[in-house]
Amino acid sequence: MPFIPHTEEDVAEMLTSIGARSIDELFDEIPAELKTGKLTQVPPGLSEMEISRLMYERAQQDGFYLSFIGAGAYEHHIPAAVWQITTRGEFYSSYTPYQAEASQGTLQLLYEYQTMMASLAGMDVSNASLYDGASALAEAALMAVRQHRTSRRILVPQTVHPVYRSVMRTIVRNQAIEVVEVPYDPATGQVAIDKLDQFAQEEFAALIIPQPNFFGVLEQVDALTDWAHDKQSLAVAVVNPTSLAMLKPPGEWGRRGADIAVGEGQPLGIPLSSGGPYFGFMTCKQELVRQMPGRIIGRTTDLEGKEGFALTLQAREQHIRRSKATSNICTNQGLMVTAATIYMSLLGPEGLYRVAAHSHANTVALVEQLEKLPGVKKAFHSPFFHEAALQLSVPADKVLNRLKAQGVLGGVLLENHYPDLKNTLLVCATETKTAEDLDKYTEVLRQALAASA
Amino acid sequence: MPFIPHTEEDVAEMLTSIGARSIDELFDEIPAELKTGKLTQVPPGLSEMEISRLMYERAQQDGFYLSFIGAGAYEHHIPAAVWQITTRGEFYSSYTPYQAEASQGTLQLLYEYQTMMASLAGMDVSNASLYDGASALAEAALMAVRQHRTSRRILVPQTVHPVYRSVMRTIVRNQAIEVVEVPYDPATGQVAIDKLDQFAQEEFAALIIPQPNFFGVLEQVDALTDWAHDKQSLAVAVVNPTSLAMLKPPGEWGRRGADIAVGEGQPLGIPLSSGGPYFGFMTCKQELVRQMPGRIIGRTTDLEGKEGFALTLQAREQHIRRSKATSNICTNQGLMVTAATIYMSLLGPEGLYRVAAHSHANTVALVEQLEKLPGVKKAFHSPFFHEAALQLSVPADKVLNRLKAQGVLGGVLLENHYPDLKNTLLVCATETKTAEDLDKYTEVLRQALAASA
Amino acid sequence: MLIFEHSRKNRRNYSQAPATRPAKNNIPDHLKRKSTPLLPEVSEMDTVRHYTRLSQKNFSIDTEFYPLGSCTMKYNPRACNSLAMLPQFLSRHPLAPEDTGQGFLACMYELQEILKDITGMAAVSLTSMAGAQGELIGITMIRAYHEAHGDTGRTEIIIPDAAHGTNPATAVMCGYKVIEIPTNRDGDVDMDALKAAVGPKTAGLMLTNPSTLGVFEKKVAEMSRIVHAAGGLLYYDGANLNAVLGKVKPGDMGFDVIHMNLHKTFSTPHGGGGPGAAPVGVAERLLPYLPVPIVAHEQGVYRWLTEEDRPQTIGRLSAHMGNAGVLLRAYIYVRLLGAEGMHRISEYATLNANYLMAELRKLGFEIAYPNRRASHEFIVTMKEIKDRTGVTAMNLAKRLLDKGFHAPTTYFPLLVPECLLIEPAETESKETLDRFVAAMKEILDEIATQPDMVKAAPHDMPLRKIDDVKAARELDLVWDPAG
Amino acid sequence: MLIFEHSRKNRRNYSQAPATRPAKNNIPDHLKRKSTPLLPEVSEMDTVRHYTRLSQKNFSIDTEFYPLGSCTMKYNPRACNSLAMLPQFLSRHPLAPEDTGQGFLACMYELQEILKDITGMAAVSLTSMAGAQGELIGITMIRAYHEAHGDTGRTEIIIPDAAHGTNPATAVMCGYKVIEIPTNRDGDVDMDALKAAVGPKTAGLMLTNPSTLGVFEKKVAEMSRIVHAAGGLLYYDGANLNAVLGKVKPGDMGFDVIHMNLHKTFSTPHGGGGPGAAPVGVAERLLPYLPVPIVAHEQGVYRWLTEEDRPQTIGRLSAHMGNAGVLLRAYIYVRLLGAEGMHRISEYATLNANYLMAELRKLGFEIAYPNRRASHEFIVTMKEIKDRTGVTAMNLAKRLLDKGFHAPTTYFPLLVPECLLIEPAETESKETLDRFVAAMKEILDEIATQPDMVKAAPHDMPLRKIDDVKAARELDLVWDPAG
């Protein structure tokens, strides 16, 4: 029996101790009419050898591509040490660190993570992670509403990741919170300030500020933050953690800094993995800490005064406060944070800066090369971080298919989420791309454009 | 500086402490005329990202094949747990357990290994590994000569792995030990007993007895062992460890059992890896233990009587006895033995039996299928374990090339080592092969034979 | 020592990052970062050493027995980890075209089908990243259902008092009022209270079965009739699905919506607190509302169903499709065990729990529901011991750590005083259970002879008892280099 | 507890092996096994748990500082492990056709070329699986060379008394008589003794440089002239190559043959005692005798050179091509570091050793060769301390374990009484060295105030001092279930 260690003798002895004649008898409290549990769609068990072969075949089927897709999930080099340590049994198979004395490894690591992440965002405090960037934004919106007390409206630019907006709507709708969207400026790809100013007289709990935004474009974060604060709204930053090594952190935006900064932690050492598991990070100002959802670790001492770590502020949480909890969140993404902490430790401030700077420089170089091709132009005239929108003169979906046939994934179509942006690709070239890769993309795109013209 | 943690300040402080002005000054005892160390063939350093990409590309270049090659190295399923545990830093990066108190993990594991391996071979004791099967056989020959005292000749059937014989000759030649070969019977593929009997009146330190032999054929081990013992020679077994789950172990051969049993440990959880690292195992009778080369672990107690483990019988070894040592061997294959011990623990006696039995059954089934093809016949009429020699009616090298083009590695050519065995393939189908795999081989061989006819 | 205390300014580890800064930098100056973030500057070796050593300070399934009630701490097969981490799976971008991910999507589709069968539901969405998010999805669908039927007066969710805290917290997050109903002496829901609670305001009932009290709710069919008759829907919290896997299907018990914690029942790793995954299954009537994406199999090709295919969907809950890598691990686990393995899980989990309950009872421990079968877990109450000796459930829990066992769940469910919720899971051997029983006996003896020593536990851990009051009072959440 | 003590008869773990026994079995009955081998019957989880826990009882580079002289315990980069274990590399059969292994062979060829450059030799063979096997190959080639020249009267190998035990043991294994020559007060070979030793019987000299005394043999060029003039050849034991990497090439020092321990200088893992790898380099005159296989690059294709290509080869030393996976790790390591990294290794290894020597000297420890630069290692002698207090080098070594440091090499080289051979390696930081110095100071203080406590060390390890006399006297090498 895979994974079940009982011998026949064990079972007999155990049943004797219990005073039952069979294992089946142990289920005698389940009404007979409910016992209809025949499984017809679960195949017979495979040996590890058989499932290994199946999974290798499926992996081979999916193959490897030279990918220029970003749009919220980014290919970065992940040092080998990250996952060799993260998958050690003591991290991989341990439980939530409720028993602090038996969990100092995880607890100290999370405290270190909180320190790194808060500092990276320029904020006072951090929690120990949320599910992903999208749900972290939704939690930030709820948090802003709790803090603001009078408004139940959230102002969200359309330059925020479209799926993040969608997830946020799904989650906040239940609490009758209204999400109001602000259009983007078609020339700059930034929040349309004139459109934003139309809301100047209305009350909002928060303004969401993406940096870089979904188009890769850099927003005027100082002005936006001050705009929010001027009207007593909270400023909620949605940021890419890699970019924070290069870009002014949310805590320094405007006169007072953002109040909450959230984002997708995946770029910090988490593999793309078809979309997950990733992790959401959430940092905020000290005064908001009791409104923050999710687990938080504190440094303290043991009875003898020795430094130690423990879950703290648990009175916010559902397992203590139940219906009065700050959030229903329980499980977080602990193992992903383990990886991210090791990743940040291996890179250090300069290493992370270089990853960011090369991602930026590669995308700049790629855009410069591609712009020279006839039929390619930048969609927006704004500085960008490591993604850019490029408008093609021919049907972009066909172009992408041609690239794919050459082993190149050329980006995502913006039209799916922005109907006005026809034939526009969002492309990304992180530090993983070499000059030859950029040339290859340029060349296959040239061919595809010629073939599609 | 990759892997070097020194900051400039560190270096300055350290040089001050030393009283040197520069690092270069620390090399001032090296005569200037010797300092010609310019490196011209070592390329500039790569980042981990760059070397990763290079190695992935080289791995992709080598690809995956459906392989029916055995001939001393065998494809078996390796449970995922084996290498996930073996590559834990505490095993992977630890040193030889000379400091017993700081190495109880490795020491206990090796003691467990010795127990498992001795029992598998049916012998009294085991060492903690040697380099590989071939060199283990050479060490066994030296050991036999030391034990025998009067003869410096070793009798080796040609049914022993040809490379093992070659390695043995390279190693024992230095000590003026003569290796005498016994031909095989072309009908049975076994040691030619009549040829062996021609040596009946000569003195030998040992007779080497392979089981299964290089052709996969099962030898008459009882008779061979008794033949050796009858003339006061040692019986040295060379065995496949997987086969020991099914086959009578060397310790039970003949009236008294083999004296020494060695072999290649690779089938016990070690990946094929282009040939290494593998490990050689060596087991022997109790009375030979002081002649055994390599490290040996003993169970003992600490000062308070608590059970513990330590290297023992070190007085045999080079670091104590220097020129009077039993062997010059120092490093063994500790990490491989770690994997093998975990492998044997995961499989248990019944699991290893099934691996052996399915390998046997698959090869039997494959041979039955292939024999039905016109132009294919078994080279030998003898029972075999999980390999068999098949004679083709057409040039076998061309057939192998055709199979390879279909993604199938069809075996090795025996002609390279046995000039008489023209167009003869040695094929192996372990438990990793499914019925579909056997059918695929049969079909591509059918096509290849047709095309070559 | 914190990793920051190993840090030294300008120490560099070039091999993990590009060797130089690039020349091109088009970031406008006013948007550039000027400060250096507090990331450590340590060598690769010191990072490896620091986190390897930290890991050794954890208890884990790979090192200790974890009889942690309601958490289903079972063995996480190592093959599930390595096969889910094959390079092609890891490198696949979530927005890569579907035809470059047919291998991955095949696994996801098959997992959906398998989970439908196991739960007896009409459809499954894999998107939920944790149990609590599964609950959120379920209650959101219940709300969507009532709204679609113009049934807007339903403002209450009924929840038994033994429920996990996530249940009431979720109901509130979804804008509902929570009506708590009590448990009777035998551990079942008080049916009279339920009848009194249901009515036109009832949106639904959330139920865990077997409950967190470790017993099977025998009248679940009647509860279903009562709630449905009142126009409410039934939510199944799958936290304890492990106990009835292959024995009863929640769909057959009358539930309309269910989440299942893959990190419990399907043995994906707990990872020190996550990631989890909690696919949601629905009966026919809730099918239109299921969150996207869902995997479809059409003409031999796998594809994502999106909002366009499912116009009534409640929407998306994650940026992509939830914790894909966790789902892969669960898929591999189910395929390893197969249909026959599903039955065995619940059988041996139940056998282990009832055996442990019997043995502890023989030692003199008080079982909270002595007349019931244990499901895959059961409750010991230390109330009498505490009243007599002052030794609490928490003291005993800490003392177990000293003896090399993780503590059971303490002080949950809230309605049993000084309780220990014990769940051994099916992957533990009788020998391990016997060693645990022996340790419990030792502690009983220690309570009799040296209660103060037990109260001061732990003694043999790297740290003595942690001061969590101080942790909350003198908040220290990030390290300050200034001290 | 031994794994066998977790075993229980008829416990089965089907997922790791085929689910049933096959029907076909053509093994003749008299060749079948009747007894059951003593392999444990434990669950996958209990195997994982047992060996995970065992691993935690080890010191290792990933957890502790290992100042182990002559062993070069440096950081083993994790990328070397994972990249050498890519599935295609692992699954490749050694006898698979060369055209299915061009990626692997390219790495091997490039490694040969790199090692040739680093050592200044004419050719390199990668086949040797350990330092001692490298020595065996080297001396066998020396023998082959003399034999090929009809020079059969050369029966002696000269070896300094400071040499590793493998040197004399190897010479004897190769049928030679060992002539040991002494070391002078400064740690150099006694040149007069060398001159007296050489002659028509001299087959060769084996030399480690820098020597195991931690000093560079300054007169190596003269030694080379003396030995060569007498018709002998020079063997370079590369155990300490790390100390001069990129600074001096053994070929330039006049050596004819060299082995280099990849598990030292090229940071492949020690693995608790192996596998190692020790490629052998030769000067032009020994090239024909180099063991096969060797990788050639011809017309853009890589192929093995065999006995056919090299008729004078001494032959083969392993069933295939040695420890291929170890070679891959070394290749990745060299590519990560590059040419500039080779220099840095020796520079910082030397800096660390000289710094540690200076700091320990300041504490009052006696340096064995106080007038010499340390190479990458140096020797402290405890003789005076032992004479005064009775505390031995071994006592100090054990006490270091208590303080979280692996012990230095003790009682080697044999000619320095009560010695500690200390090699910090380049990958350790100044902070770690300073912590080690602080621990050494603590122990010095302890020796002064409580010598008996130090003599009884270790105190804080899982075990107290192991009784190895008993281990050798009451041999217990395999577990007996009967007790």
Curated annotation (Swiss-Prot), chains A, B:
HAMAP family this protein is in? GcvPA
Q: What GO terms describe the biological role, i.e. biological process, of this protein?
A: glycine decarboxylation via glycine cleavage system; nucleoside metabolic process
Tree of life domain:
Bacteria
Gene name in the database record: gcvPA
Q: Which Pfam families match?
A: GDC-P
EC assignment: the record states 1.4.4.2
- Matching NCBIfam families, A to Z? PRK00451.1
Lineage summary: Bacteria, Pseudomonadati, Pseudomonadota, Betaproteobacteria, Nitrosomonadales
Q: What is this protein called?
A: Probable glycine dehydrogenase (decarboxylating) subunit 1
What the protein does comes down to: The glycine cleavage system catalyzes the degradation of glycine. The P protein binds the alpha-amino group of glycine through its pyridoxal phosphate cofactor; CO(2) is released and the remaining methylamine moiety is then transferred to the lipoamide cofactor of the H protein.
Q: Does the keyword Membrane apply?
A: no
Q: Name the protein family.
A: Belongs to the GcvP family. N-terminal subunit subfamily.
Q: Which GO terms describe its molecular function?
A: glycine dehydrogenase (decarboxylating) activity
Record PANTHER family: GLYCINE CLEAVAGE SYSTEM P-PROTEIN, GLYCINE DEHYDROGENASE (DECARBOXYLATING)
This enzyme catalyses: N(6)-[(R)-lipoyl]-L-lysyl-[glycine-cleavage complex H protein] + glycine + H(+) = N(6)-[(R)-S(8)-aminomethyldihydrolipoyl]-L-lysyl-[glycine-cleavage complex H protein] + CO2
Tell me how this protein assembles: The glycine cleavage system is composed of four proteins: P, T, L and H. In this organism, the P 'protein' is a heterodimer of two subunits.
Cite the Gene3D superfamilies for this sequence.
Aspartate Aminotransferase, domain 1, Type I PLP-dependent aspartate aminotransferase-like (Major domain)
Q: Which UniProt keywords apply?
A: Oxidoreductase
From Swiss-Prot, chains C, D:
Q: Report the SUPFAM superfamilies cross-referenced here.
A: PLP-dependent transferases
> Per UniProt, which keywords does this protein have?
Oxidoreductase, Pyridoxal phosphate
Q: Where are the transmembrane segments?
A: none
GO terms in the biological process aspect are: glycine decarboxylation via glycine cleavage system
Q: Which cofactor does it need?
A: pyridoxal 5'-phosphate
Quick one: where's region Disordered? 1-33
**InterPro entries for this protein:** Aminotrans_V_dom, GcvPB, GDC-P_C, GDC_P, PyrdxlP-dep_Trfase, PyrdxlP-dep_Trfase_major, PyrdxlP-dep_Trfase_small
What's the Enzyme Commission number for this chain?
Answer: 1.4.4.2
Residue positions where N6-(pyridoxal phosphate)lysine is found in the record: K264
**A GO molecular function for this record?**
glycine dehydrogenase (decarboxylating) activity
User: What EC class does the entry list?
Assistant: oxidoreductase
One Gene Ontology cellular component annotation held by this UniProt entry = cytosol
Disulfide pairings: none
Q: What protein am I looking at?
A: Probable glycine dehydrogenase (decarboxylating) subunit 2
Q: Native species of this protein? A: Nitrosomonas europaea (strain ATCC 19718 / CIP 103999 / KCTC 2705 / NBRC 14298)
What gene makes this protein? Answer: gcvPB
